[in-house]
């Protein structure tokens, strides 16, 4: 953990001085049963800091249930609630990005999920560390109450990523973190289509501190990250911050070449010195051919993954489109259900 920095220089408070603003970016996907209890826990936790202005910015990631209706109901009762509704399901990382883009005017931004696995009270400790001078405070899991499969795969992923990544990405850390506005502004410059935000934040730098916490169980519902999405997310982390798979292909090629030289020398020596013991070896030859063909296809797949990421990136498509925005005490709900697709994309997209 980095050494504690000097306290953050906050403006001298006068009756006309605005209070520091802390914005929560809260991605939501099929969390209709969790929205109300989460918001109640969050407002209770933040009520102890009435010296700060709070904004609760929920980002609906194309939920299929009643999540959007529940969020708009929260907004009717709490003007601090903002709602962004993505035009389609773009994934957790893009939803967080949309929230960060919208919350860039805050002094600090806290990203957390809405399933109550990340306790809202921990975010208040993050604010304290931010006031002490940290630019990024990431919540590091001391323990987690997940299934054995989830714990095992997460443990393996973070260790593999730690060995392969070109930047120092903390282990056992998700997206639950606080970022100073300077960090948020820098993260906004990273527009990768295949996003791995915890790697991006690590790459940005600044003063980063860990905050240990115990992760709870989900309050209700099931995880929005099935096995397929977990594997894709892991691939984004490895391919986005490491060229080690490409280097492994080169090393494997040299190793197989060396092995083929040894095998050729062995076959030649047997043929010359003990011809009566030589065997045609068609079975061995067939197995070897299939093995090499399989390895070549795997290598092409790895190269293709990098090429595919490059192709997706150079297309320059917007990361997301907004179908609805509701923010601030005086902002109304802006929905675009009848707008033609081309105009809708221009009006609601951030590239």
Residue spans for each PLM region:
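Structured catalytic core of nucleotide-sugar glycosyltransferases
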Residues: 2-147
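Short, hydrophobic secondary-structure boundary micro-motifs
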Residues: 54, 137-139, 169-172, 247-250, ...
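Short conserved micro-motifs on helix faces and helix-strand junctions that flank
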Residues: 27, 86-88, 177, 250, ...
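Acceptor/aglycone-binding surface of glycosyltransferases and processive sugar-polymer synthases
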Residues: 82-102, 117-200, 216-228, 232-235
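Conserved amphipathic alpha-helical interaction elements at protein-protein interfaces in regulatory
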Residues: 44, 48, 73, 77, ...
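Hydrophobic helical membrane-anchoring modules
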Residues: 2-18, 198-351
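A generic fold-level signal
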Residues: 17-19, 51, 103-104, 171, ...
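Residues in soluble alpha-helical coiled-coils and helical-bundle/repeat scaffolds
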Residues: 29-33, 117, 121, 188, ...
